[in-house]
Amino acid sequence: MYMAADPTEDVVDKSGPLTDLALTLPIFVGYHLGVIFLPVRNAADVVTRELQSVANFNLWAYLALTLAIGAGYVTPLLLAGRGKHMQPGRFAWMGAEGVIYAVGMRLLAGYAVAYLLAQVATLDLGFVGLMNAAPALSSSVEAAGTTDALGERAAGAIMSLGAGFYEELVFRVGIYGAGAAVLLLLFNVTRAAQKFFFRVAWALLAACIFSGWHYIGELGDSFDLMTFAFRTVCGLVFTLIYQFRGFAPAVWTHALYDIWVLAL
């Protein structure tokens, strides 16, 4: 006797690399179709300027290249006969998962920072105050040079998509994932317990680097302990999501959190 497969099995299971990449398609394409109309881009974005150069700074050629890259996202899955992963329901689930994680992350970071400030500083905003002061995890929307509320929100949404994709690519896939793999190999860490504690320590360091990233450069924020700690906790949450759920859920969570802060 055979039992029917659970239709949600593919949705809730951790995705493979190709599926993970394909599920970020709306984030990637949405950012690149929008950022071309803004005077700034995400600091981790190394693609937009290259695309503009290849397109000879022609708007229509740039848009065509962006859509072609988007098509390239899904082609490997289609060729592998895994087009089911591109069904609308899969993206809807990814968005819902991102919303849940973003809300939980904001609450967790708020509680953690409130506790930290109560221990090491005299500043006490209270939990509600910290929620209202929760910082963005991408470039400041004021940097986009918009002049009206609607324009600021649109720019904030676009920059949020870029932060979600590129900062997760740099900090979770690059610094945390690839960095840990290289260091484990370099130092010949083989025991399971050693690997675990190494990854925990490396995750904390990567989260601190991620947080510090937001204070660097002309458009960086002014440093303060509260926002640094808040972003560090968020970096740890993103790392947990990346480790146990994959790249796409981390991207969606990051983008949706920033949209919540910058555009809503």
Model-identified regions with their sequence ranges:
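Alpha-helical transmembrane segments of multi-pass membrane proteins
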Residues: 23-44, 109-110
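Interfacial helix-start motif at the membrane-water boundary
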Residues: 52-69
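Alpha-helical transmembrane segments of polytopic integral membrane proteins
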Residues: 39, 71-73, 105, 109-110, ...
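Juxtamembrane helix-loop-helix connectors linking adjacent transmembrane helices
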Residues: 46-54, 79-164, 180-193
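Alpha-helical transmembrane segments
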Residues: 17-33, 97-101, 202-209
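Short, Lys/Arg-rich, polar N-terminal cytosolic tail immediately upstream
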Residues: 1-14
